[in-house]
Amino acid sequence: MKQHPKISLIGSGNIGGTLAHLISLRELGNIVLFDVTEGVPQGKALDLMQAVTIAGSDIKIKGTNDYKDIKGSDAIIITAGLPRKPGMSRDDLISINTGIMKTVAANVKKYAPDAFVIVITNPLDVMVYVMLKESGLPHNKVIGMAGVLDSSRFNLFLAEEFKVSVSNVNSMVLGGHGDAMVPLARYSTISGVPIPDLIKMGLSSNENIEKIIDRTRNGGGEIVALLKTGSAYYAPAASAIEMLESYLKDKRQILTCAAYLQGEYGVHDLYVGVPIMIGKEGVLKVIELQLTTEEKALFDKSVEGVKKLIETIK
């Protein structure tokens, strides 16, 4: 891949702007910041260019309202769409954001058919499905940002519970990116020690871990309720950067993302949050975990929720 890959960000709101800032500071590539609102991407691009000048970076950032400017992009991150407001679920956004995603997909197909695409727009599992079907891109090049964010929330709450550094915590969250997501304590560890073992040692309790799991499921809603006029953007942007960097640098990281399943986990023709390996070809492999009967039941329930949402847009 060339020295400065071309990275296009579709949507210049809070997440789009934060993404551009993080990409420029890490010097991951030159940036095209797109939005339909005139002046917004241009203004943010100018502000960001002045910010990276202080950091001594020569990364180029262009703000635009013209899809032609995404031509030849190596990677595209999509945040365009209506954000959640208090009292709204991710699923309430479905009809408006489906229309937006279809327009974005048509332009990605036209101008950047070889790009690696990360979708952030909610409801995530449906939006990434729409992107795949409408763009015609190969499924290994289209993924959704889900589990990295959900796991980061789970990691934080577990670190607080066990009073350890977040760097010691690895957690696993499967399923749809919604209220039926499946945080897995059994596959979550503190310095390699599984959470159930730590409970047996008396360092926490099943009750406390269940509360943490519930808080993780409502992690986005908790922030929406506090902000009142928007939704989370720092953590979603940081999560997408982790995925983007694994692709651009061929790091082959195993990250939980919304991936297209073709029989894995017993699921066909759906995007669901599972661990995948991301490298220079996109999704290199889906990691299939051995789930207990109870875990599989929760996962299947989450999958059913995604299926029902997909049906509403067909």
Swiss-Prot record:
Single Gene Ontology BP annotation: lactate metabolic process
UniProt xrefs under InterPro entries: L-lactate/malate_DH, Lactate/malate_DH_C, Lactate/malate_DH_N, Lactate_DH/Glyco_Ohase_4_C, Malate_DH_type3, NAD(P)-bd_dom_sf
UniProt keyword Transferase present: no
Tree of life domain: Bacteria
E.C. numbers: 1.1.1.37
Residue positions of the active site: H177
Keywords, ordered alphabetically: NAD, Oxidoreductase, Tricarboxylic acid cycle
One Pfam family this sequence matches: Ldh_1_C
Catalysed reaction equations from the record: (S)-malate + NAD(+) = oxaloacetate + NADH + H(+)
Molecular function via GO: L-lactate dehydrogenase activity; L-malate dehydrogenase (NAD+) activity
KW Methyltransferase (keyword) present: no
Regions crossing the membrane: none
Binding locations of substrate: R84, R90, N122, R153
Residues binding NAD(+), per UniProt: G11, S12, G13, N14, I15, G16, D35, N97, I120, T121, N122
Function: Catalyzes the reversible oxidation of malate to oxaloacetate.
Family stated for the protein in its record: Belongs to the LDH/MDH superfamily. MDH type 3 family.
Name under which the protein is recorded: Malate dehydrogenase
UniProt source species: Rickettsia rickettsii (strain Sheila Smith)
